[in-house]
Structure formats: structure tokens, C-alpha cells
Curated annotation (Swiss-Prot):
Family (UniProt): Belongs to the aspartate/ornithine carbamoyltransferase superfamily. OTCase family.
UniProt-listed PROSITE patterns: CARBAMOYLTRANSFERASE
Its EC number(s): 2.1.3.3
Localization, UniProt: Cytoplasm
Catalysed reactions, semicolon-separated: carbamoyl phosphate + L-ornithine = L-citrulline + phosphate + H(+)
Stated name of the protein: Ornithine carbamoyltransferase
GO BP of this protein: arginine biosynthetic process via ornithine; citrulline biosynthetic process; L-arginine biosynthetic process
Record-listed carbamoyl phosphate binding positions: 61-64, 88, 112, 139-142, 268-269, 296
Organism expressing this protein natively: Bordetella pertussis (strain Tohama I / ATCC BAA-589 / NCTC 13251)
UniProt pathway annotation: Amino-acid biosynthesis; L-arginine biosynthesis; L-arginine from L-ornithine and carbamoyl phosphate: step 1/3
Taxonomic placement: Bacteria, Pseudomonadati, Pseudomonadota, Betaproteobacteria, Burkholderiales
Keyword annotations: Amino-acid biosynthesis, Arginine biosynthesis, Cytoplasm, Transferase
Gene Ontology CC annotation, any one: cytoplasm
Chain sites annotated for binding L-ornithine: 170, 228, 232-233
Purpose of the protein: Reversibly catalyzes the transfer of the carbamoyl group from carbamoyl phosphate (CP) to the N(epsilon) atom of ornithine (ORN) to produce L-citrulline.
Length: 313
């Protein structure tokens, strides 16, 4: 095991989007471009050949697991996968003790769990960088991938408008952090009773956040339209109630037509065609969903590289 960075700098974590400065986000996105270009040219990029990633899953995953595991292997490292079923986490070991032990044996940890406070408790007792692979409150790796995908297809996101249609979940709160940091406007439209929590969002700067009761209005002129499932993990008991409440929040061709002519559509997946988005949209010409999914791999490689090696010359 090696020190957190080649510069022996302070220990850094990525638990929410605002843990990095705008300049650091820009650096990671630029490194993503370079790393992806190497990947497409089959050029090896193995700066983490002696590093080990521990992945801790307390929530099920497909894209998060595959992208982190493949990414670490592609950079020359190794991976240990832990779940509540095969570790002491499932037997009531305090997460602080788990952090103290795991972080003495690996170089970096990714956790996908429930409450944000849980990953914060882990990080506060870890000797190595910790990455949020998803919590109930935030999903920063996904938003990094989404922003990179927008830049890749349409250029800088500063000054643009992102329309979030659907549940005010971890994605929407992370989009808001990104908007505040990177200078774009976030339109949010949710059904009554599912709005952003005023206590959590505080008072965003003027022009950062606009909330709409009508999803069509939220899409008006948007450069990026995005959504997520109506029922997130942990809320399955509300599924039928949510289907009724969200019926008018299905992103369809009419909503995309209201957006900017060059607008793109994104979805963090898994998607339920006919619920939060129509098949026509997610499988249509404006959809960049599959590039978005692939880009989780590349941004997370850049993220791990940055947390372990610092900024490279």
C-alpha cells in the first residue's frame, strides 16, 4: 500500500460534488477526456498498478460495480468487492471500525450505501480516500459522468439550462450542487409533495434554480433534459402511489420538442420505458444515455487517479 498521493498531500474524499473546487472538477473532466481517448485507441493507461480498491455495497448495483471494477483493473490495480452479506457490516460491526480496518489494507474505498451520514462516518475514520458510489442524498459520480457527456456532445455546460423532470432525489440535489459550482441553470419540475426540500437547498444564488409545477415549462429552452426512476431504492412500498402521482412527468417527444433544438436527453439508468420516459425518447436521436453510461467508467478512472496521485503535470 502506498501514500494517498505522490505529493503526500492532505487526504481527500469525494462524498458530494462540492467536495471539489470548480477548478478540480475541470481538471478531472479534462483527465477524463485524455483517459477515454487512450481507451478508445487501445493505449494502456496503468498509473495505479500497485493500488487496491475496496468496493463496499450496501445497495445493489450494476453500472457502479462494473465501471469501478473495470476501471481499476484497466489502470493496473486490483479490486476487492464487499457486501453486507459477506462482511461484518451485515453483522452490526460499527462502520467506524470497518473503516479503520479496511483503510489499513487498501488504497482507496468506494461505498454505495443508504444515508449520507453513514459514508461520512466511514470517511472520518478512514486513512485512504473514500468515494461516494451513491447514497440516498447524493450521486456525485453520476453527475460527473453526465457533465462530461454533455461537454463531449455539445461543449461547455456553463450558461446552459438543465431540466430535471421527476422525483427530487439524490440526482436532483447533486445537479443543484453542480449548477451552483459550474455556472448553469437548473430547472426542476416535480409533482406536489415530491419537491426539493427547502431546508436542504437553502437559498441558491439568483439564476441557479428555477422550480416549475408544469414539466413542459421546465423543458422550455433546456439544453439537457434528464430524469430518473419514479421509485428509488428503499421506496418500493410507495410504487403504486408514485406511479399515480408522477403520471404527467414522463419525458416524451413533446417535452423534448419544447427544449432547445440541440437538446440532449439523459437518464442514469435503469430506465422504465413508459413511466419516467418513453421508448421513443430514450431510444431516439436526442438520447445520449449509452454514452452517459459508458462515461461512468472514464470519469471514475480520472477520479481515482486524482485522489491517489494528485494533479499530474
Amino acid at each position: 500500500m502506498t501514500p494517498p498521493t505522490t505529493q503526500n498531500g492532505p487526504l481527500r474524499h469525494f462524498l458530494q460534488f462540492k467536495d471539489f473546487s470548480p477548478a478540480e472538477i475541470a481538471y478531472v473532466l479534462e483527465r477524463t477526456r485524455i483517459i477515454k481517448d487512450k481507451f478508445k485507441r487501445y493505449e494502456p493507461h496503468m498509473p495505479l498498478h500497485d493500488r487496491t480498491l475496496a468496493m463496499v455495497f450496501e445497495k445493489a448495483s450494476t453500472r457502479t460495480r462494473v465501471s469501478f471494477e473495470a476501471g481499476m483493473y484497466q489502470m493496473g490495480g486490483s479490486v476487492i468487492n464487499l457486501t453486507s452479506n459477506d462482511s461484518q457490516l451485515g453483522r452490526s460491526e460499527p462502520i467506524e471500525d470497518t473503516a479503520r480496518v479496511i483503510s489499513r489494507m487498501v488504497d482507496i474505498v468506494m461505498i454505495r450505501t443508504f444515508e449520507q451520514t453513514r459514508i461520512e462516518r466511514f470517511a472520518s475514520h478512514s486513512r485512504v480516500p473514500v468515494i461516494n458510489g451513491l447514497t440516498n442524498e447524493y450521486h456525485p459520480c453520476q453527475i460527473l459522468a453526465d457533465i462530461f457527456t454533455y461537454i463531449e456532445h455539445r461543449g461547455p455546460i456553463a450558461g446552459k439550462t438543465v431540466a430535471w423532470i421527476g422525483d427530487a432525489n439524490n440526482m436532483s440535489y447533486t445537479w443543484l450542487q453542480a449548477a451552483e459550482m459550474l455556472g448553469f441553470t437548473l430547472h426542476v419540475s416535480t409533482p406536489a409533495g415530491y419537491e426539493l426540500d427547502p431546508a436542504r437547498i437553502g437559498a441558491p444564488a439568483a439564476g441557479v434554480l428555477k422550480q416549475f409545477k408544469d414539466p413542459m415549462q421546465a423543458c422550455q429552452g433546456a439544453h439537457l433534459v434528464t430524469t430518473d426512476v419514479w421509485t428509488s431504492m428503499g421506496y418500493e412500498a410507495e410504487n403504486e402511489e408514485r406511479r399515480a402521482a408522477f403520471a404527467d412527468w414522463c419525458v416524451d417527444a413533446e417535452m423534448m420538442a419544447a427544449a432547445d433544438p440541440q437538446a440532449v436527453f439523459m437518464h442514469c439508468l435503469p430506465a422504465h420505458r413508459g413511466e419516467e420516459v418513453t421508448g421513443e425518447v430514450i431510444d431516439g436521436a436526442q438520447s445520449v444515455v449509452w454514452d452517459e453510461a459508458e462515461n461512468r467508467l472514464h470519469v471514475q478512472k480520472a477520479l481515482m487517479e486524482f485522489l491517489l496521485l494528485g494533479q499530474l503535470a
